[in-house]
């Protein structure tokens, strides 16, 4: 059987976030995500279609992924008589006697002042705002969207709003850089590549960690390197590309372009008839890479764990061609933000609720600790939005 509980989810998230989470926010999420999910997919709720895995899981994938969920929710909102103003960013909170009573917004050449009994801030994070991202993260590649500028953080400046975990931004390993300069997760590709005998080496041509270890530990090891490269034979490379193209991250036409000798942009993807030729293109010491390959293959043949605790599922071919992709650490979702209470109200630095002001989604700080736990950011978007809407509905009904 499969046993789970809100209490277990809380402890798992606290452990994953290295106890840097705001426990009250984690408990709020764990205790309401079930009800929020039922509303999201239920016929008497939002009725958003989703993919069923057929096995116990904490994760959920809406049809059409995030865009599909947003499209369905927008259609439901408008069908219920709601008005959705796109390309109309809020610029300022309307505050009277310390209470938030509306927002000012601009869009389509028109200025709006919208008064309301309550305002929900759901403007996302600040990963794209260099002024808010701590310097230690800027050496990594940004992988978020351009709109994550932390607008709400500026909007609450005059309200003495409490901000928590503003020094934390989510980082993840297994990333490449796209031609646009943005980071891109490679999880769909690396899973198949590692099963076919792929491994990573650093700038010295040496393996440095168990590539199949958990993301946090792998990332700490990557931070010690100047660079790292995923080394693949033909089978591993085919598996990698299958995962990435099936996820519509890039096309095989892109790969052909990136592998050409006259391509000098991102990503750094190279091909060699032998490991030595591949290393020459990457300015890596061939003898070190060849030694790494031999040690890896010896463990694969004996089905024993290597120095880093990995038992290779398959050896790397001794015949070319061979391929390499430079791998990076990426950052995207911000983990800090507004401090809320269990009614989704934004708190001030005295831990008092700011009248009329609520928050949901990534603009809220403290859920994740210092690293994101799979599926919980989308889960929090749903749960916190559901909770905030219910809280505001109760206020409006009074």
Named regions from a protein language model:
Residues 107, 114-179, 378, 387:
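Glycine-rich loop(s) and the adjacent beta-strand/alpha-helix scaffold that form part
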Residues 153-155, 162-284:
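An anion/pyrophosphate-binding glycine-rich loop and adjacent beta-alpha core
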Residues 193-195, 332-334, 374:
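Short, small/polar residue-rich loop motifs at catalytic or cofactor-binding pockets
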Residues 92, 288-371:
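A glycine-rich dinucleotide-binding beta-alpha-beta segment and adjacent secondary-structure elements
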Residues 1-83, 198-200, 204-207, 235-237, ...:
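Conserved N-terminal/central alpha/beta ligand/cofactor-binding core
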Residues 1-2, 184-185, 376:
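Conserved N-terminal glycine-rich FAD pyrophosphate-binding loop of Rossmann-like flavoproteins
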Residues 63-117, 153-159, 338-339:
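Helical element adjacent to the flavin cofactor pocket in flavoenzyme catalytic cores
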Residues 152-162, 285, 290, 380-398:
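Internal hydrophobic alpha-helix adjacent to the cofactor/substrate pocket in enzyme cavities
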């Amino acid at each position: 059987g499969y046993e789970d509980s809100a209490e277990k989810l809380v402890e798992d998230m606290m452990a994953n976030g290295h106890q840097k989470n705001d426990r009250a926010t984690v408990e709020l999420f764990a205790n309401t995500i079930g009800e929020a999910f039922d509303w999201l997919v239920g016929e008497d709720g939002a009725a958003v279609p989703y993919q069923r895995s057929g096995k116990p899981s904490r994760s959920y994938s809406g049809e059409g992924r995030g865009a599909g969920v947003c499209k369905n929710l927008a259609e439901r909102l408008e069908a219920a008589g709601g008005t959705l103003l796109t390309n109309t960013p809020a610029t300022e909170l309307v505050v009277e006697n310390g209470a938030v009573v509306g927002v000012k917004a601009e869009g389509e050449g028109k200025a709006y002042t919208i008064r309301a009994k309550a305002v929900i801030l759901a403007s996302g994070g600040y990963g794209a705002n260099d002024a808010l991202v701590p310097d230690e993260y800027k050496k990594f590649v940004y992988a978020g969207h351009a709109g994550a500028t932390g607008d709400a953080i500026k909007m609450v400046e005059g309200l003495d709003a409490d901000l928590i975990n503003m020094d934390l931004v989510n980082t993840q390993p297994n990333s490449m850089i796209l031609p646009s300069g943005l980071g891109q997760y490679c999880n769909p590709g690396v899973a198949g590549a590692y099963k076919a005998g792929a491994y990573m080496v650093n700038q010295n041509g040496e393996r440095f960690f168990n590539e199949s270890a958990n993301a946090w530990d792998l990332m700490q090891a990557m931070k010690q390197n100047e660079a790292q490269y995923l080394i693949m034979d033909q089978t591993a490379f085919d598996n990698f590309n299958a995962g990435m193209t099936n996820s519509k991250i890039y096309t095989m036409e892109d790969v052909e372009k990136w592998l050409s000798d006259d391509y000098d942009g991102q990503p750094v993807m190279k091909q060699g008839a032998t490991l030595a030729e591949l290393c020459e293109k990457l300015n890596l010491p061939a003898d070190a890479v060849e030694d790494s390959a031999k040690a890896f293959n010896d463990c694969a043949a004996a089905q024993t764990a290597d120095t880093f605790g990995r038992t290779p599922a398959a050896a790397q071919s001794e015949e070319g061609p061979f391929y390499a992709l430079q791998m990076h650490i990426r950052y995207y979702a911000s983990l800090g933000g507004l401090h809320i209470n269990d009614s989704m109200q934004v708190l001030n630095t005295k831990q008092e609720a700011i009248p009329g002001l609520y928050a949901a989604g990534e603009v809220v700080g403290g859920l994740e600790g210092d690293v994101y736990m799979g599926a919980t950011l989308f889960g929090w978007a749903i749960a916190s939005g559901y909770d905030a809407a219910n809280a505001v509905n109760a206020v409006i009904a009074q």
